[in-house]
Amino acid sequence: MRKMMQRFAEARIIIPAPQNGRDEIAQADAEAAIREAFGGFTRIEGFGSWMADDGTIYREPVYVYDIAAPLLMGAGEDAGREWAGAMTALRRIAAQIARDMAQECVYLRSPAGRVHFVKPDGTDYYQDVEPHPFPRVSG
């Protein structure tokens, strides 16, 4: 039987910086959930901006959480279960943050590099939405 090797891939969750006591509690709860599921994280303070569908531009300080998500390297069901477990935990944490901080969605980058915008119910924001076309850049 071939021995499984433990490897890690980076996941990322981005949340708005807390604005009030309720947000600070939600942030502390999220950090506890990340530590419990993955053993720890690195938090970086940053700045984010996004444009709503109506054209309104939002700018806000954010916290970026980099998380080492364990991935079993090897064949078989154990590797698949490990991957599914990491994604389930990440999605659950992102949805919890969205609920607790009253966010429409929370940015989650999976260990495979795919970006999700997770809604409070745990589904992807863009799951049933037609993607926006990229604007043409002249040059």
Where would I find each of the regions flagged by the language model?
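Positively charged, small/polar-rich N-terminal and surface patches that mediate targeting and assembly
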Residues: 1-139
